[in-house]
Amino acid sequence: MSPLAPEAEKLAASRLFLAEIERHIQARHDFGFETTLAGRGYLRLIRRLRTDGWRVELIYVALPNAEMAKLRVAERVSHGGHDIPVSDIERRFLRSLENLFAVYASLVDRTVCLLNSGETPEIVFTQQGVHREVKQATIIQLLQGWRQT
């Protein structure tokens, strides 16, 4: 992979990632992965897994606003991690919440949404199918409110 061709590097990494997922599926090994949910690219995979008898669970780690997400990225960069442009953080923050509430939470077998803004994550809601059990009403209202801005 070449530092002079970062887009080619991202594409190669993506191919490796998808091949690893497919390897686990074929072997019927449990697996997990992290995503921002900013896109809808995993919908087909989730539908396929559920059709094939897999149980699909989503653990969504939420932040109260895009500003905190920017601070988390800045902290990561200060420790040698990769940077993300501010415009991408803002766009992904909103798209992620929209996708969580509009598509993913009801598609998977079970969703747990955690607020990760303090010392200990707090459960905001759990959901199975269309049945949502709200644990933190003010937080879920805040998160749903961001979708409409």
Mark where each language-model region is:
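A conditional alpha-helix N-cap/helix-loop micro-motif detector
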Residues: 10-14, 39, 93
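Anion (oxyanion) recognition and catalysis
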Residues: 25, 50, 105
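Hydrophobic anchor at the start of a short beta-strand
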Residues: 31, 56, 111
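Acidic, metal-coordinating catalytic cores used for nucleic-acid/nucleotide bond scission
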Residues: 33-43, 63
